[in-house]
C-alpha cells in the first residue's frame, strides 16, 4: 500500500501544485478589514476544492455575532465505511499574514513562483500548503485501497482568523462542539526540525499579553523645580520591570511556578538528541554573544518547555530630538508571558496585578490591562497512542526515525483540545527557514508531498489504534 500511495502522489503532484497556486493567489489577510471579501473567497475556494476531492459535506461557517461579525471557517466531513471507526478532526487555517514590507519581496506575494524546489507566496507554508496536503493524502489513500470512503471518519475545521488572534474561534468550537466531536485532533500548522531531520511537535506554549500604564503628576513638570522631590513615573516603571526576574532569570511573580511541571529526564533526553547548534542559532537572532535565561536549563528547554516573561516595549516622557528636562506625567510598557502546561492565563494575570500593586511607590498610580483571556498551552505526551500513531505514519513517509520537538509560540490548539476533549497530534512539514510572517515566504514542495504521504498513512495508523484513543490533551 505504501508504494501505491507514493506513486499516486507523485503522479498527481502537478495537479496538486496547480490547485495550491490558484488558492495562493487569493489575498486572504484576516487582519486587514479591506480584505474581508478575499477571506470569504478563500473559504469558498477551499469548500469547493474539498467537495471536488469527494467530501460529501462541505460548509462555510460564519463566526462572531451580528454586531461583531467575524470571518468564515470551512467545515467538511467524510464518514468512514465502518461506523465504529474513530473520528479524526483536522485543524488548520486559510487566512494569511499581511505582506508588508512589500519592497522586500523578490516577487509579488500573491503570484506564486517556483524556485529551486521551493514555492514562494504568502501562505505557502503558513498554512494553505499544509492544509491542502490532507486532501491529496485522502485521494491517495482511496486510490491505493480501491475504496470509496476513508478508514476513519474525517472532519476538517479550517478557520479564517488565526493570523488575527482567532477572536471568535473558541465560541465557534463551543457552538459546534457536537458536530466537531472527535477522537483525535490533527494540527498541521507547525514546523519540523529540518528537511533532513523530520520531527513531530508535541506541544506549544500559551501566552498572555499585558500593558502597564504608570501615572504620576497631572502634567509634565520642570525637572529643575520638581526633579528629585516628586515621584517619577519612568523611575517607578523601571523599578517594576527590573524586579520582574530574579538573579537566576526566574520570573519573580509569586506563585508563577506553582503549577509548572518539571521536565522528566526522558523528555530532556529527547531534546538533547536534536542536532542543535547554539552558535548558529544565535546567529539567526543577529546575536554574536551568549544565550541567556533561566539558570539550570538549556536553550532548547527554555524556549519550548519553560515559562517566560518578556518586556516587549517601553515608552514615556520625551523621546524626540534634543533634550527636554522634565519629570514626565506617565510611562508605559507592554509585556508578554509564555506559559506551559497547567498554567492558567487568568491566574498569571492576577499574579502580575499583585506584583505591581505590592511594588507601586506612593504618589504613583498604576493600571494593568490584560489583552483578552490569553491562550493556554497545549501538550501531548510522546507515549500517547495518538502521538505514537502519528510517529509511525511519519516514519513510513520519510523512511527514517522521527524526533520530537515543541514550539515556543502559541495558537488556538489548546482551545481545540480543551473544548472538544480530544488529544492533539501535530503533523506538519513546515520549516523555520520558510520565512513565515516575513517577506518571501516559501515552502519545500517535496515536503508538502511527504505531508500528503504522512496523512494517507495516518488514517490507517489511527484506525488501528482506535481502542486506545482516549483522553484529552494536557493544557
Predicted features and spans:
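N-terminal capping segment at the start of a domain
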Residues: 2-6, 10-41
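A non-catalytic alpha/beta surface segment that caps or lines the substrate-entry region
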Residues: 29-84, 110-112, 393
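An extended, acidic, His-containing surface patch that forms the Zn2+-binding/catalytic region
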Residues: 52, 83-85, 194-195, 252-330, ...
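Active-site metal-coordination/substrate-binding segment of hydrolases
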Residues: 84-158, 450
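A common structural junction motif
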Residues: 95, 244-248, 353-363
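A generic structural motif
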Residues: 125, 218, 337-345
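Histidine/acidic-residue-rich, glycine-tolerant segments that coordinate divalent metal ions
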Residues: 151-232
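Polar, glycine-rich mid-to-C-terminal structural blocks
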Residues: 217-220, 224, 229-281
Amino acid at each position: 500500500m505504501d508504494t501505491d500511495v507514493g506513486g499516486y502522489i507523485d503522479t498527481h503532484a502537478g495537479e496538486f501544485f496547480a490547485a495550491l497556486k490558484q488558492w495562493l493567489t487569493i489575498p486572504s489577510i484576516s487582519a486587514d478589514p479591506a480584505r474581508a471579501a478575499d477571506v470569504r473567497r478563500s473559504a469558498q475556494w477551499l469548500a469547493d476544492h474539498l467537495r471536488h476531492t469527494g467530501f460529501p459535506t462541505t460548509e462555510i461557517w460564519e463566526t462572531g455575532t451580528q454586531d461583531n461579525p467575524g470571518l468564515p471557517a470551512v467545515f467538511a466531513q467524510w464518514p468512514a465505511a465502518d461506523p465504529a471507526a474513530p473520528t479524526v478532526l483536522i485543524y488548520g487555517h486559510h487566512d494569511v499574514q499581511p505582506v508588508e514590507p512589500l519592497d522586500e519581496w523578490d516577487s509579488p506575494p500573491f503570484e506564486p513562483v517556483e524556485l529551486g524546489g521551493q514555492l514562494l507566496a504568502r501562505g505557502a507554508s503558513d498554512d494553505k500548503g499544509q492544509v491542502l496536503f490532507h486532501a491529496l493524502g485522502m485521494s491517495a489513500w482511496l486510490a491505493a485501497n480501491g475504496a470509496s470512503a476513508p478508514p476513519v471518519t474525517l472532519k476538517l475545521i479550517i478557520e479564517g482568523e488565526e493570523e488575527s488572534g482567532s477572536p471568535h474561534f473558541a465560541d465557534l468550537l463551543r457552538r459546534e462542539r457536537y458536530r466537531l466531536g472527535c477522537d483525535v485532533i490533527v494540527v498541521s500548522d507547525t514546523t519540523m526540525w529540518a528537511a533532513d531531520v523530520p520531527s513531530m511537535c508535541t506541544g506549544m506554549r500559551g501566552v498572555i499579553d499585558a500593558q502597564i500604564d504608570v501615572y504620576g503628576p497631572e502634567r509634565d513638570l520642570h525637572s529643575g523645580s520638581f526633579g528629585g522631590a516628586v515621584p517619577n513615573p519612568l523611575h517607578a516603571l523601571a523599578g517594576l520591570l527590573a524586579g520582574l526576574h530574579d538573579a537566576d532569570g526566574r520570573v519573580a511573580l509569586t506563585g508563577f511556578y506553582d503549577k509548572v511541571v518539571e521536565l522528566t529526564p526522558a523528555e530532556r533526553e529527547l531534546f538533547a538528541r536534536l542536532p542543535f547548534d547554539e552558535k548558529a542559532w544565535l546567529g539567526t537572532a543577529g546575536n554574536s554573544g551568549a544565550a541567556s535565561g533561566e539558570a539550570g536549563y538549556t536553550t532548547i528547554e527554555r524556549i519550548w518547555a519553560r515559562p517566560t516573561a518578556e518586556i516587549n516595549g517601553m515608552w514615556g516622557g520625551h523621546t524626540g530630538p534634543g533634550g527636554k528636562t522634565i519629570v514626565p506625567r506617565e510611562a508605559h510598557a507592554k509585556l508578554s508571558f509564555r506559559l506551559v502546561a497547567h498554567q492558567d492565563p487568568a491566574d498569571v494575570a492576577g499574579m502580575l496585578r499583585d506584583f505591581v500593586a505590592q511594588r507601586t511607590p506612593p504618589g504613583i498610580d498604576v493600571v494593568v490591562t490584560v489583552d483578552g483571556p490569553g491562550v493556554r498551552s497545549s501538550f501531548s505526551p510522546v507515549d500517547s497512542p495518538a502521538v505514537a500513531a502519528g510517529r509511525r505514519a511519519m516514519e513510513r513517509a520519510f523512511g527514517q526515525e522521527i524526533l520530537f520537538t515543541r514550539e515556543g509560540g502559541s495558537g488556538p490548539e489548546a482551545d481545540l483540545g480543551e473544548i472538544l476533549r480530544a488529544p492533539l497530534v501535530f503533523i506538519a512539514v513546515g520549516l523555520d527557514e520558510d520565512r513565515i510572517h516575513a517577506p518571501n515566504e516559501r515552502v519545500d514542495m517535496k515536503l508538502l508531498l511527504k505531508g500528503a504521504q504522512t496523512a494517507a498513512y495516518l488514517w490507517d495508523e489511527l484506525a488501528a489504534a482506535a481502542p486506545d484513543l482516549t483522553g484529552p490533551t494536557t493544557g
